[in-house]
Amino acid sequence: MVDLEAIGRRAKTAARALAKLSTEQKNAALCAIADGLLARQDKILAANAADVADAEKGGTPPAIVDRMLLTPARLAAIAGDCRQVASLPDPVGEIFDRRELPSGLRLYKRRVPIGVIGAIYEARPNVTVDIASLCLKAGNAVILRGGSDIARSVAATTEVIALALEQAGLPAFAVQSIIDPDRELVRQLLRLDRYVDMIIPRGGAGLHRFCVENATVPVIVGGMGVSHIYVEPSADFARAVPVIVNAKVQRPGACNALDTLLVHRAAASTFLPLVAAALAQHGVELRCDLEALAILADAPGHEAWNLKPASPTDFGCEFLALIVAIKIVGSIDEALDHIALYGGHSEAILTGDPISAERFTREVDATAVFVNASTRFNDGGQFGLGAEVAISTNRLHARGPMGLQELTTYTWIGEGDYLVRA
């Protein structure tokens, strides 16, 4: 039987020890984890193969099976990512926002770890190391709860991590995993606020909703949302098409992939056939409003395009597949209103008008807003953060890609010369 109280106590104790470590000690531990993953890859891959075999027997969709799968190349990449985290600047201990007050008090903020992070994720065994490495570098202990379909993979990987931590002189309990498939344990973890300081869910809408509805621990919500690109008549059409193809096709299952394409009416008759032909080459299904459908149905070559009329629900749908909704708008105001209703994750405008670009960036409320760039850039690695634990759509604590700095908080430090308050 899993004793969550004991797991929480051990994590809290480990967090206190981690907060005192030097950057060199943390980096050495991360490199030891990377070495351990490669040295013990046979054990990890065997555990993963058993998980994958069960998933295939159970009829799990191929896309999810592929997400579950670890190979020597993928494991080497995970180890490389761990080393990359070791090479990143350490945010812990950073001094900022210095000021001296009229009272003589010298005041500043020092960046400190959050404490204990709970991570709940689905069929993504790579997340085990991704989150553990980032939490450790930021001085946090972490309690991992992977999906039951990757339980063996998580157990084997966590065992390797714990051994590496011990060898590096760190508490082995700095990274713990809950392997029991009982979902009630997830509910209990979400309410373990005596020990856990933050919950990060990584998965679908159902998981995020479950966490928000059941947690007393603060939850970072993210990784979901409808992403838009709005094309203006002033855009360079020839250069805009590859941006849209990249946003939709490069990784359609990603949360920052394009879902809805908004095209200004003055650009539609010229631009839509260009982008439809390009997307069709990649097998993208085009779900069009009536006006867009009429334009495309009359365009040369439309027989080869997968055109379908859009339903009202398509414009609020995160497809996570080779599907895009297309809507014609009469103005930037209409585009902004549409994005305000359905968007909030990754939003972009393709335009040659700096006034429109400035207005778009000021008025769109999203985790990231781009001008003449793909929505796929909304990513910790692309932002130069090294890696991320999630893309937060929260407004409080962190928003957008959560890297090392977002896994810390700060303490006010006040220094005086035996000062008393007047």
UniProtKB/Swiss-Prot annotation:
Gene3D superfamilies: Aldehyde Dehydrogenase, Chain A, domain 1, Aldehyde Dehydrogenase, Chain A, domain 2
BP term (GO), one: L-proline biosynthetic process
A Pfam family it matches: Aldedh
The EC number(s) this enzyme carries: 1.2.1.41
A Gene Ontology cellular-component term: cytoplasm
GO molecular function: glutamate-5-semialdehyde dehydrogenase activity; NADP binding
SUPFAM superfamilies linked to this entry: ALDH-like
Keywords: Amino-acid biosynthesis, Cytoplasm, NADP, Oxidoreductase, Proline biosynthesis
Subcellular location: Cytoplasm
InterPro entries noted in UniProt: Ald_DH/histidinol_DH (IPR016161), Ald_DH_C (IPR016163), Ald_DH_N (IPR016162), Aldehyde_DH_dom (IPR015590), G-glutamylP_reductase_CS (IPR020593), Glu-5-SA_DH (IPR012134), GPR_dom (IPR000965)
Pathway this chain belongs to: Amino-acid biosynthesis; L-proline biosynthesis; L-glutamate 5-semialdehyde from L-glutamate: step 2/2
CDD domains listed in its UniProt record: ALDH_F18-19_ProA-GPR
Domain of life: Bacteria
Family matches, as PROSITE patterns: PROA
Catalytic activity of the protein: L-glutamate 5-semialdehyde + phosphate + NADP(+) = L-glutamyl 5-phosphate + NADPH + H(+)
Claim: Oxidoreductase is one of the keywords in the record: yes
Function description: Catalyzes the NADPH-dependent reduction of L-glutamate 5-phosphate into L-glutamate 5-semialdehyde and phosphate. The product spontaneously undergoes cyclization to form 1-pyrroline-5-carboxylate.
Protein family: Belongs to the gamma-glutamyl phosphate reductase family.
NCBIfam families: PRK00197.1 (NF001221), proA (TIGR00407)
Listed name of the protein: Gamma-glutamyl phosphate reductase
Protein encoded by which gene: proA
